[in-house]
Regions:
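Start-transfer (signal-anchor) and selected internal transmembrane alpha helices
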Residues: 1-17, 85, 95-96, 109-120
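Aromatic- and kink-enriched transmembrane "portal" helix at the membrane-lumen/periplasm boundary
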Residues: 20, 65, 69-76, 101-112, ...
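Extracytoplasmic catalytic/substrate-binding loops of multi-pass membrane glycan-assembly enzymes
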Residues: 22-34, 44-56, 73
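Short hydrophobic/aromatic helix or loop-helix immediately within or flanking a transmembrane segment
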Residues: 41-69, 80-81, 88, 178, ...
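Transmembrane-embedded, aromatic-rich helix segments that form part
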Residues: 169-170, 184-191
């Protein structure tokens, strides 16, 4: 993880942008069903999205008195938080990929400024792309999927550099979590 103030500033800006475009209530698509099922720990249409339902239920119920708003707004806020995490993972992936070190992943060592500038640019392009931004504005399983896959990609890059068993174990755990959210995660985990 980075302690760079630029990382935290860029992450805050992305979250702020997402907050300004957040749906105030139920959006279209599966959003209404997912919000309703997470309010009473039900099962949405197949495959059911158990991780999303549990996390959304916990977020809306436990933080409800603190955050205020309707369960729909709180579920939409959760989507914005997940896509902010996925954008932060893009930053971390680019920074890690270009970092110099003993087990360097690329043939050149990018200077710190270029590494950070590239990470901010990649984060911004990802976060503000139309599809990512759309799913950050309302409750949908894709925002959580983006965050989980972003973590898996970052951990894969980190493992390529460090060969740490702890990173591999965390990556395996994240792979399992991703499969309980969205079945398309298998496409990232298959190799």
């Amino acid at each position: 993880m980075t302690s760079s103030p630029i990382f935290w500033l860029a992450t805050s800006v992305v979250f702020g942008v997402y907050l300004t475009t957040l749906y105030p209530s139920v959006a279209g698509g599966d959003s209404g069903e997912l919000i309703a099922e997470s309010c009473h720990l039900g099962t949405a249409h197949p495959p059911g999205y158990p991780l999303f339902t549990l996390v959304s239920w916990g977020f809306t119920q436990m933080l409800g008195p603190l955050l205020g708003g309707t369960p729909a707004w709180r579920s939409n806020l959760l989507g914005a938080m997940f896509d902010t995490i996925s954008a932060a993972c893009v930053f971390l992936c680019v920074e890690e990929w270009l970092r110099p070190g003993p087990s360097q992943l690329v043939r050149f060592a990018a200077p710190a400024f270029a590494r950070i500038a590239g990470a901010v640019a990649a984060m911004g392009l990802f976060a503000l792309s139309p599809l990512i931004w759309m799913y950050a504005s309302h409750a949908e399983v894709f925002a959580m999927n983006n965050a989980l896959i972003g973590c898996i990609v970052f951990l894969s890059i980190r493992f390529g550099r460090t060969k740490s068993p702890r990173v591999a174990e965390l990556g395996a755990f994240m792979c399992g979590l991703a499969l309980t959210n969205q079945h398309t995660a298998i496409l990232y985990e298959g190799e």
